[in-house]
Amino acid sequence: MSSKKYELDAAAFEDKPESHSDAEMTPQKPQRRQSVLSKAVSEHDERATGPATDLLPPSKGLTTEEAEELLKKYGRNELPEKKTPSWLIYVRGLWGPMPAALWIAIIIEFALENWPDGAILFAIQIANATIGWYETIKAGDAVAALKNSLKPTATVYRDSKWQQIDAAVLVPGDLVKLASGSAVPADCSINEGVIDVDEAALTGESLPVTMGPEHMPKMGSNVVRGEVEGTVQYTGSLTFFGKTAALLQSVESDLGNIHVILRRVMLALCAISFILCMCCFIYLLARFYETFRHALQFAVVVLVVSIPIALEIVVTTTLAVGSKHLSKHKIIVTKLSAIEMMSGVNMLCSDKTGTLTLNKMEIQEQCFTFEEGNDLKSTLVLAALAAKWREPPRDALDTMVLGAADLDECDNYQQLNFVPFDPTTKRTAATLVDRRSGEKFDVTKGAPHVILQMVYNQDEINDEVVDIIDSLAARGVRCLSVAKTDQQGRWHMAGILTFLDPPRPDTKDTIRRSKEYGVDVKMITGDHLLIAKEMCRMLDLDPNILTADKLPQIKDANDLPEDLGEKYGDMMLSVGGFAQVFPEHKFMIVETLRQRGYTCAMTGDGVNDAPALKRADVGIAVHGATDAARAAADMVLTEPGLSVVVEAMLVSREVFQRMLSFLTYRISATLQLVCFFFIACFSLTPKAYGSVDPNFQFFHLPVLMFMLITLLNDGCLMTIGYDHVIPSERPQKWNLPVVFVSASILAAVACGSSLMLLWIGLEGYSSQYYENSWFHRLGLAQLPQGKLVTMMYLKISISDFLTLFSSRTGGHFFFYVPPSPILFCGAIISLLVSTMAASFWHKSRPDNVLTEGLAWGQTNAEKLLPLWVWIYCIVWWFVQDVVKVLAHICMDAVDLFGCVSDASGSGPIKPYSDDMKVNGFEPVKKPAEKSTEKALNLSVSSGPHKALEGLREDTHVLNESTSPVNAFSPKVKK
């Protein structure tokens, strides 16, 4: 039958191999090597438990004025964060490869006394820096606003009243309330009373620690039981979080990968443009005997227009828009460049508890009974009777049982006596009387092997119970036995309940989707090996699991070998996850996978996860993570579960597609422009077609037209961050050779069509060739010089915008994905402005280049010249798109530059075996430990409790010390 499942925080059940807390350590446990984190904790604990004179006396509360004075003295209660001044952001926008080229052009124009052109270039420089500064500030404000939603609060006694305030403004001497369910907002001393504190996020200890006035709860821990008043002793960098700063500094902050890519693209385009423009400059001096001034002016203007001035601005805007989109999916981005890295993730190292699982223990449907009339419902009622069912639960086990049992049925009984859980007996017991029949009986619930020793028919059911225990243990499922006395006072086994922290309903499907999207998932947990194996089986992950003793032992996290990936990569790739790991193992696992060639994402929630989060390409702090984990992470989840991470990947891939289409377009536009003027300078010169104008011996545009093209294009490109795209089905990585090839194909068609129109225009302009020109065949009058210049301006401008629509769909036709309304409207507006400017341009001579509007004319045919240019551009746009698709088909067929290869680690993966040695490496054995294998080989004939005794001293077996839950953990025989 189905029963109500109760959800319980699984942190209390998760088994981790180590404790650094203030609680008493189990004496049998061998002392493990001390990590960097352990040293930080020890140093902090020494200070916290030092002489009483080092600590403030119990506080009775502060006034607002006192708190403000102390805040000025001690600073805010938060991790220090470096912020770039606003003015420095603006100054940076005025310097760099792109701005430097523009400054050179401005200086040259002013040196040549071209004041209007120099002023235009200077205005563009200032406008570019201002827009870049504004977009950067806006993106930073968006991230800061999202971060503010993560700020913790604290209940503090100020001005003679309790109030809720931002934990960041706490100061030493504040009186705070530490209550069940709340986070400890700072390092506090307890004034009076005791509380149970969960320090798992700080120390790895899975069991709550009981703390009194002699202890100091640390910021980042959580109160799980009780309520006390405490005095704030340390805040900000003086807390344990400050003590872990040295560990986090072992990972240097890498420059975002996207900035490296942008620099490469900018330098490549600048180099190409500079070389071609210098060739034009030299040729003009030699061929046309142009003055140094005119030749230099032409070369500089073409160079300035060809370089992508707004490249970083558009990318920053696109990433900022992506971060807002991610926030709608419950993902807060703390570093914009992480979005680009997330799109290339092909390896996800995920926590088990809370991410893959519900982080809630549940009673399962499977229930084993030994007498007729007993079932899951009746067994749950008996288990609830062995507790105070109408009082707040005393422990995690009672909480789980009472949440699943029918408490109304329990009210039919009166509890005469109750014995709470005792770590020695490992069970609870109660004496009850049935209000309906008056029958008096005892009930008990506890560890299966303990209850088995109590029942009167142990010999009859021993083998059956042992088989059940072994089968459940082999699957990593915990179990709880319930027994009841009969009228003779004999104990009868009522049933065996099973419980575990189940997977989230969507986890299995999410992992399947992840693999379909090219992302491998590795589970990392501090839990027992058997529990990890069972979870992998339930989630269709490889149940082959590595434990901590199989991993390489690294002494210093600051000095990791550079050959980890080569030596141990195959071993780690061949398994489905890692169990019984320590915090530094996570750090090493991530580094090994990165060295193996994978783009690795890591999820974590505690201070001890912070180094691994920092080391990963993308660190993800899961829902409920500590401030230290959030500070180290690139992304913070505000909703639990793995599905949120997959959504982050898909949204990031959408952002990547937008940046890819923009870079492809920007490279194409640059190549189209510079190659057009380069070829036109050498082969299609007005002089060769009879031009006698000394200022029109070679074809060029006035600076104003160049700048109009630049401003309209860059303005339209600001909307590309909102474009519609389809995310890739595989991880994305930058393949710049392929990007340049794709852009070159688009540029070649656009440039070729522009050169052809220039040739047609020059023939229509020339008195010598007009009779055989297309202008004559179409019934158009001979083309004036001014209209030839304006026509080519319109052609180049239209081709630029149409190329944008081709570049955004990759290897598909331009209509494969409709553009977003904002991008479409931006392009239409820019095209209308260009068309209107070209049609009604005032007849003038800017920069001594004659210009004239295309719509000015005597006949209707002449007035329709802009329409002919549009038709010409659209026809060639279709040709460009067909050529693009065919080129992509050919590139995919030959896998040009690995364009269809997966973004995965390199090299084959060898199957893993227990005795696997990689390059001579053999896992280091821990000394003086009783292995699980030895305990598992004990004979069951002496009873399951004998076999279980051998497991009690093993550090990797679930802790049996004091927890009423861990007493029912899986133990198996070989």
Curated annotation (Swiss-Prot):
It is an enzyme of class 7 (translocase). Residues 1-61, 952-974 are annotated as: Disordered. One of its GO terms (molecular function) is P-type proton-exporting transporter activity. It is found in: Membrane. Its EC number is 7.1.2.1. Its main location: membrane. It is a multi-pass membrane protein. Keywords: ATP-binding, Hydrogen ion transport, Ion transport, Magnesium, Membrane, Nucleotide-binding, Phosphoprotein, Translocase, Transmembrane, Transmembrane helix, Transport. CDD domains: P-type_ATPase_H. GO terms for cellular component: membrane. It comes from the Eukaryota. The keyword Membrane applies. GO terms for biological process: proton export across plasma membrane. Residues 1-23 have a biased composition (Basic and acidic residues). The chain crosses the membrane at residues 93-112, 118-137, 265-286, 295-321, 631-651, 662-684, 698-712, 738-761, 813-840, 869-887. This is Probable proton ATPase 1B. The lineage of its organism: Eukaryota, Discoba, Euglenozoa, Kinetoplastea, Metakinetoplastina.
